[in-house]
């Protein structure tokens, strides 16, 4: 699985100077003359600032424009990025050595101070980063205090020992800390670039340190990137132009793919799965992904503030029917929030999983009646989702289940991505579609999302027992002990139902047969354009 770094009680040293993850073209391969790729993304990126990114549309582009201390290979294992080696004697104080040929797109060196500035900016309340919590999750000293306004950004536990040595101090030992540094939130930004003005992320202005630079952007139409000639491994970059097309309708993206306008789609309509398998064999992929599709309930206001209502709604979602009939592309029912493919997680059987849907429906009716709802007083609520045919399809199916089994009147509401994010962040919903794809391959990436102080806690769930068991998990020294804590946390989620996990993701997409180097088996779907190339066809 993803945790490739071995941990011992004494000295820990990882040295990978000679390794890199780039396009590896086999000897004898005949490349196409035109190395231009068109990638589909599901929506217009909300921001190209790593500290302001929140969703996959922008993250996919940001991974081409910036590079962190480490990268992931095709299996999700950690490989060098800007850092060539890292070490720790106690899993608490980490030292990273940066490569001396890492440069920004303007040719200036990438230094340890760039990382200090960027990470301090991430946690600075003035930045309003939706991912500031990630620094606290990683346990960087004083991160949470800075986020809470109780300390200043310069007190963050990160220091530039010299231009090429970065020292990070954690508030507790964390064996998988290096894995976390692959996250986009920890990508460096150039101080002079950020401070040049509000339009620093526009084409011609943005100065990244990734394999590509932003050449063109037409909002809601396309983003075009071309090789960064100053990138340290640019000699191995094969693709000379990558165009990202934001299309939130899977059918439209699939139509463009079949017409030859797109080389990779981020998804495809579920109802086309069998037809696509027949029409374009070898181009349809559905490997498991480190992600869960779920509905979040507003636990602070409205009818879903009542735990009985939330639990009844969760129980009447027929997850077996959803995965087998509504979706039907290899997804698994989500009886818990943490996906089965997560490293270090062995789930205990859920009571829901051991009951028939008829039994679940019967118990749900009793719960809803106890909450004061029934034929004379039907439950009314709004189900919000971001615009997408697949999301709509699932919402219609769930609304039908709730109406048929509980008599619930459901109003379906769809919003474009940016509006949906605003509604989600302000708590303007009863029930909202959500998903989480792990930021790293360990159960805490999912379960900490529901802790009371987490900015990603969409449902506003506040449960001291839940917070306590996850805090305990972070101090455990063995996988077995952590697994017990994680299962205890999952039990609380099942009983309190701040969310209703629906299914575990598969990474459904279409890929042209002449495109090579796509890391289809990366569990987190981390795909850098610089590893890909097009063969003659």
From Swiss-Prot:
InterPro entries: Peptide/Ni-bd, SBP_5, SBP_5_CS, SBP_5_dom. Changing residue 424 to A: Cannot bind murein tripeptide. Residues 1-22 form the signal peptide. Its main location: periplasm. Keywords: Peptide transport, Periplasm, Protein transport, Signal, Transport. Pfam families: SBP_bac_5. One of its GO terms (molecular function) is peptide transmembrane transporter activity. One of its GO terms (biological process) is peptide transport. It is found in: Periplasm. Coiled coil: none annotated. The keyword Protein biosynthesis does not apply. The keyword Signal applies. L-alanyl-gamma-D-glutamyl-meso-2,6-diaminopimelate binds at residues 42, 54, 56, 289, 424, 435, 437, 439, 506. GO terms for cellular component: ATP-binding cassette (ABC) transporter complex, substrate-binding subunit-containing; membrane; outer membrane-bounded periplasmic space; periplasmic space. Part of the ABC transporter complex MppA-OppBCDF involved in the uptake of the cell wall murein tripeptide L-alanyl-gamma-D-glutamyl-meso-diaminopimelate. Is involved in the recycling of cell wall peptides. Binds the cell wall peptide L-Ala-D-Gly-gamma-meso-diaminopimelic acid. Can also transport ordinary alpha-linked tripeptides such as Pro-Phe-Lys, but with much lower efficiency than OppA. Cannot bind typical tripeptides such as Lys-Glu-Lys, Lys-Lys-Lys or Ala-Ala-Ala. The complex is composed of two ATP-binding proteins (OppD and OppF), two transmembrane proteins (OppB and OppC) and a solute-binding protein (MppA). Belongs to the bacterial solute-binding protein 5 family. This is Periplasmic murein peptide-binding protein MppA. The lineage of its organism: Bacteria, Pseudomonadati, Pseudomonadota, Gammaproteobacteria, Enterobacterales. The gene is mppA.
